[in-house]
Amino acid sequence: MKFKKIIISDNTESLLNLKVRIIIQYIIIIILLSILYSIILLYNKEKNKARTNIKLNNIPELEIKDEYIPLKSWNNCLAKNKLIEFINNISNIPKEARIAVFDLDGTLFQETDPVYNDWRIYQNRVLNDSNYNPTEEQKKLSNKISKAIKEHIMPDDLEIEVYYSTAEIFKGMALDEYDKYIKDYLKQPADGYNNLLRGNAFFLPMLEIIEYLQKNEFNIYIVSATDRYQVRSVIDEHINIPKSNIIGTDYELASINQGNETGYNYKYNKNEKLILKGELIFLNSKFNKINGIIRNIGRKPILVFGNSEGDSSMANYAISDNEYNSLAFMVLNDDLIRERGNQASADKMKKLCDKNNWIHISMKNDWKTIYGLNVTRNNKTH
């Protein structure tokens, strides 16, 4: 068999080369289109991602916050409902008249440790402070406090004695030193409790009332028989109010260089240190709380919170002939399990509430917790 020799002409070869070039160009175009398509997809993806982030960042803060619930540590009770009803009807009360005053010990802060916090500070200074040399009279007074604690009887004259003597035992101490002294004491464990420091012994349900009132544009004042400087130290980091809103017993100040000169005659020089002079000026207790309110605030409060007969004067002052609706609340120390309650004292205050048209607050029945759910009694009292 013979094969014929195939001869490819120049024209045929040129045609083949052209077809190959066209195919290659098509392939290149397809590759470029694929790359372009991928770039477009990537661009759109990043663009959509950016839009999503913008939307998330523009969501108002209130939409992602938990809803504020007032008085969360309270059970459904008369006091809670009366307060909420009162707040829901204050639109006619101007902001400058929205004044609430609170006693401190027994109303906002523990007073059964097992006695007033400032009395325990007095004993700490006289009996435990190696930097202080107490007089025999001061030691005797400290023993009287111990006896009162043991026998659960508080003589009427003991309060006045302690306040006058407290001025003396801190005589010569600068205000910043006094503040540190109080705060160091408050770092100690609270007597008779687990998981509680003295300085944290605030009643959580009452702090919620302050928060609730502040959200409704109330001006909060603390009106206490405890000395004003000590109250400032106690509430610091716990209650957000100006220092000027604290009304308490006043101790006189002096310049460290003043000597025996009176405040009327002495002229203060630049950068002189101020110290406690050792003298009581004003005891802000009982009826004198009205004096303190008038001098420091200048108008009647429309809400009063207290816990004892020492608060009765300012309570009746607020709810008598007030140009605005007003209420007075009294805390009953009737919880014998979570707190060192005193049922006889609570029953007496309950009768006073009924007599004077005050609203009682029961620690036992109205509060879900007192100091926090992790705080328990241990019955170890010194």
Roles of regions detected by a PLM:
Residues 22-104, 112-113, 119-121, 125-132:
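Non-catalytic pre-domain segments flanking phosphatase-related domains
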Residues 54-70, 81-84, 88, 92-94, ...:
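C-terminal cap/substrate-recognition subdomain and adjoining C-terminal extension
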Residues 1-18:
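N-terminal Lys/Arg-rich, disordered targeting/topogenic segments
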Residues 113-199, 204:
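A metal-dependent, Asp-based hydrolase signature
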Residues 77, 172, 287:
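Electropositive phosphate-/nucleotide-binding environments in soluble metabolic enzymes
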Residues 21-22, 307:
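Residue-level recognition of hydrophobic positions within alpha-helical transmembrane segments
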